[in-house]
Regions:
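N-terminal amphipathic, basic helical "cap/leader" segment at the start of enzyme domains
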Residues: 2-152, 344-350
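Conserved beta-strand/loop scaffold segments within soluble protein domains that form the structured core
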Residues: 109, 115-402
Length: 402
């Protein structure tokens, strides 16, 4: 793919118009444009790139994707099959926020008793208006971790998403739920054929850029469920929908956060999902991910254990069929003494589906007495199915258990 095509995907005017439509502060515009500048300079990954091994990205023509505009229509409640199923299993909820790009509507509900206690569960766009200074620090601060063309694309073009903040010493037993329902048909744009004065309709795939920021303050406890799904549509045949998502978790000292993430999409969806968690002193993150369907899922789950007593437990379940492809990359980065991580992935594949799991345990020189474990087991239920496992260790300390 040519650089010119990649550049056409994000024009500077597109980023500036997004800021103008949303009425965003100058600092956010500067941050978006910085992401756009870096995006143009960053090479496109290929199937030979280490973190993208076996993922088919070479044929993804970014110039044929159009970013979906922010959802403006608010409604009281949205009924979706995936959401209804989740509610049946979860029971009562602390709050629900749904972005339905298929209908161009969104729905937000939260227990008022929680907001009275200082809990923030709000669309990211709304939160920017009410908590601009706090979000500025979270969004603009440069942090360690993976950064490539897709993370920079999300930085420049994220349209909405969720901000969840739990005050210190607050325990919330009921779960919060955030769901994104992807567009189901290609977008038509009027273009002029070369040498003709008439316009013709050209179909483009669509791109969605959700962003989640979760902050758990000292000694708080919260349960969070995030789902991304889509419905099949004949109108979408042959047109890829790109979902480029980012989830950022901040756990202060003593915080306890449980996250369940479900991805269940149609065969025309390519999901790139980046999860990054910063885990403080004596804080615990339980993260469960379920990859249940898509054309391709490329997910990176990065846990950075920043202080003694930090614990990260990551569990993954992948169920593949047809010609679906799943690529999961976990990174447990131990940067302090006395930290613990436990990563377990289970994969079952039918038909011609494929998966690759890459697990990296990093132990910095200072991170003595690290206790870390990772396991990936695969069940192949079809003669054409294939699963690869690539565990890695990068250990600089000498008193560890891995």
């Amino acid at each position: 793919m040519s650089d010119s095509k990649q550049g056409n995907t994000i024009a500077r005017e597109e980023v500036e118009n997004l800021c103008r439509i949303n009425g965003e502060p100058t600092w956010l515009k500067d941050n978006r444009l910085a992401g756009w500048e870096a995006y143009l300079q960053c090479p496109m990954p290929t199937g030979k790139t280490e973190d993208w091994r076996t993922t088919i990205v070479d044929t993804l023509d970014l110039s044929e994707l159009t970013a979906v505009e922010p959802i403006a229509k608010a409604t009281k409640e949205i009924t979706l099959e995936l959401l209804t199923s989740a509610k049946a299993n979860l029971g009562d909820l602390a709050g629900v926020y749904v972005e339905d790009y298929a209908t161009g509507s969104k729905s937000h509900n939260v227990d008022k008793a929680l907001t009275d206690k200082g809990v923030v569960f709000a669309p990211l766009k709304t939160a920017l208006e009410q908590h601009s200074d706090v979000l500025k620090g979270l969004i603009t601060t440069e942090r360690a971790g993976l950064k490539d063309k897709f993370t920079l694309m999300n930085q420049a073009l994220w349209t909405d998403g969720l901000y969840l903040r739990v005050p210190k010493n607050t325990t919330i037993d009921l779960p919060f739920v955030f769901m994104v329902n992807l567009p189901v048909k290609a977008k038509e744009a009027a273009v002029k054929a070369e040498g003709s004065k008439d316009s013709e309709a050209e179909k483009f795939g669509q791109a969605v850029f959700p962003k989640v920021i979760l902050v758990a303050e000292e000694n708080s406890k919260v349960n969070f469920v995030t789902m991304i799904g889509s419905q099949e549509s004949a109108q979408a045949e042959g047109q890829i929908t790109l979902a480029n998502a980012a989830i950022e978790l901040h756990l202060a000292a003593g915080a306890n956060v449980s996250v369940a993430e479900v991805s269940n999409m149609g065969e025309e969806v390519f999901l790139v999902n980046r999860i990054k968690a910063f885990i403080g002193k004596d804080a615990t993150l339980d993260y469960t991910t379920a990859g249940l369907g898509a054309k391709q899922i490329k997910a990176d789950i990065e846990t950075i254990l920043t202080a003694p007593g930090a614990t990260a437990r990551v569990n993954g379940v992948v169920l593949g069929d047809s010609d679906e492809h799943f690529a999961y990359n976990t990174i447990a980065d131990h940067t302090a003494t006395d930290t613990n991580s436990n990563i377990v992935f289970r994969v079952a594949l039918k038909d011609e589906s494929t998966s690759i799991y890459q697990g990296i345990i990093k132990v910095e020189k200072i991170a003595q007495r690290t206790d870390s474990y990772q396991s990936n087991k695969n069940l192949l239920l079809g003669t054409e199915a294939r699963a690869d496992s690539i565990p890695k260790l990068e250990i600089l300390a000498d008193d560890v258990k891995c």
